[in-house]
Amino acid sequence: MSQQQTGTLRNSMSGSLLLAKQLGFEPKTVIDVGAALGTFNLYETFPDSRHLLIEPIAENEPYLAKICRKLKSAEYIIAAATKESGVFTLNVSPGMVHSSLSENRVTDSSNPYLRNIPAITLDEICKERNLPGPYLIKVDVDGQELDVLAGATEILQQTEYVIVEVTLFGQMYDVMSFMKSQGFAAYDIVDLSYRPTDQALWQVDMAFVKESGHFRRERGFATGEQDIEALNSHLKAYRESFIKHIDTHYSDPVEPEPQVSQAVVGEDYVII
């Protein structure tokens, strides 16, 4: 079934995940880092996978518990995934939407938006809970994605697909460089978000796949006679549409030809 038939937009995370599934990818374990109130397209696209939801904001726990009860095989952890285990300070926004980590522990308990929380690494938790690969990992942790990935270098060896929220005004190129160092290539860009001040592109969800993995078996743009024929037909129509646009909007106006009267020549005069 095509994505047009399902009504799923190709340039969304749902569309990207559905495409991965249509291409034969079935992760054994799906890891949702920064689960918040749930990433439903992960759970709905891969209902038979084992799901691990990691979320640092304790106020979201009741909702994650409801989600996990409905999934075939799922569990959640209230903790922060980062580059090393321990205890970190979480600074939570008043709306419980965003948070940030600090290595300094809280000593003043009067601020309800600052709290100490346990920190884990993905490598450790997967080993501890015997979570099998291949993995699909989604990371959305408000700018600290690199720390999460740094704590996952072992399981990245068994990971085919990684989705990372990146910002064009922050860590985008650092994430791309790190993923390349781990043998991954950029695969997809979805869910574009524009900042309201000037409509500049602010952040995107970026998918990475193994350079030598499942999604890089084909290197050409089109394969097979039918694909090439369809491509050539598309390119021909594309060219014709350009020519039509040029003829309509950029051609010089056609000037009418001058009217020439017929002349009658007499013996001593000319009648026009």
What label would you give each PLM region?
Residues 1-272:
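Phosphate/nucleotide-binding beta-alpha loop and adjacent structural elements of enzyme active sites
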